[in-house]
């Protein structure tokens, strides 16, 4: 069974560094190769590595865009393919001109370094400054409600609840001893008390039941 060998012309990227005639290479291949330590084996190993690297470079260029001819350079250095992408960094940190005009607060914070945020803002992860049950500190522009309000009328003292079934409020009792000139007024007040609705109901309950006309 014969073995057919096909030889392609050497490409410019696959030219080995150690020049060997084509006949010597074919004789080495037909003879079954040589040892790894010989210079011919080294040249063959370098040649296969260069072929692999050249094939990868050609594939990457073919996938990325139009591939110029071997050994040819682009006409202008600025029109290199593919174009270089700039890193996505903050324009303030990289020194480039920002696309959006920053506010005055932002410029002041950039100039002064890590400063405090403006009043009224709450940072992420920050707890509430005022907990429940604690009074907030008043600003000098915020007046106190108690100081601005005028003195109102005095509140009447709370009357104690009477014990028992009486639901009507009792008149205030005089703690001072009774005077002789006010005895008649007290009797008049007693007669008025007896004429209340509650007293009338009590009287009706005490009276005997009316007899029926049939008896």
Swiss-Prot record:
Widely expressed. GO terms for cellular component: nucleolus. Keywords: Apoptosis, Nucleus, Tumor suppressor. Residues 35-215 are annotated as: Disordered. Residues 169-180 have a biased composition (Pro residues). Its main location: nucleus. It comes from the Eukaryota. Induction: Up-regulated after serum withdrawal. Residues 185-215 are annotated as: Necessary for nucleolar localization. It is found in: Nucleus, Nucleolus. One of its GO terms (biological process) is apoptotic process. Apoptosis-inducing protein that modulates the tumor suppressor function of CDKN2A/p14ARF. Enhances the stability of CDKN2A/p14ARF protein by protecting it from degradation. May act as a tumor suppressor. This is Proapoptotic nucleolar protein 1. The lineage of its organism: Eukaryota, Metazoa, Chordata, Craniata, Vertebrata.
